[in-house]
Amino acid sequence: MSALANRRARVERKTKESEIVVDLDLDGTGVVDIDTGVPFFDHMLTSLGSHASFDLTVHAKGDIEIEGHHTVEDTAIVLGQALGQALGDKKGIRRFGDAFIPMDESLAHAAVDVSGRPYFVHTGEPESMVSFTIAGTGAPYHTVINRHVFESLAFNARIALHVRTLYGRDPHHITEAQYKAVARALRQAVEYDARVTGVPSTKGTL
């Protein structure tokens, strides 16, 4: 088992719409430093890193004077790429993870398979979240982007990710429950299992 592997990654991405830098350590303690210019997204990424026990630094500059959409989605792309790189050969990991997370009246569930086959399912959000906006002192966060964030994360990390809202009323609570559920599912999936001596697949590769 490659338990002493350096499971860290640094990924940078620059386009005409954004500049993103992500540093990720899968074997961290939840130390986070997030600055995207979209305050609620900063809050969600802080929760993600903290509850996954990842050390996570995200610095992003984007065209938030137009809207935060580009910055949020591009950050999710880079975070997914960093996760995929940090996983390395995947030897010794649990591979699968899932978590139910309540946030007051809301309940979300996330399930992860570090399979090397990207797939994404997102169900259960109330229709009202398509048009809901969480305002802040910086660029607003539109909850319609939740799906895009998790989809970009899944496909760029090459994982299968299912996220569902079982019930809820407050879009803030629903969104936060989803991010925390993804965090805890990822934490479980990437953890080392002392009983796994190689790649956790009957094919011998992920």
Swiss-Prot record:
GO terms, biological process: L-histidine biosynthetic process
Top-level class of the enzyme under EC nomenclature: lyase
A single cellular component GO annotation: cytoplasm
Organism: Mycolicibacterium smegmatis (strain ATCC 700084 / mc(2)155) (Mycobacterium smegmatis)
Keyword Lyase among record annotations: yes
Reactions the enzyme catalyzes: D-erythro-1-(imidazol-4-yl)glycerol 3-phosphate = 3-(imidazol-4-yl)-2-oxopropyl phosphate + H2O
Pathway assignment: Amino-acid biosynthesis; L-histidine biosynthesis; L-histidine from 5-phospho-alpha-D-ribose 1-diphosphate: step 6/9
Protein name: Imidazoleglycerol-phosphate dehydratase
Localisation: Cytoplasm
Primary residence: cytoplasm
GO molecular function per UniProt: imidazoleglycerol-phosphate dehydratase activity
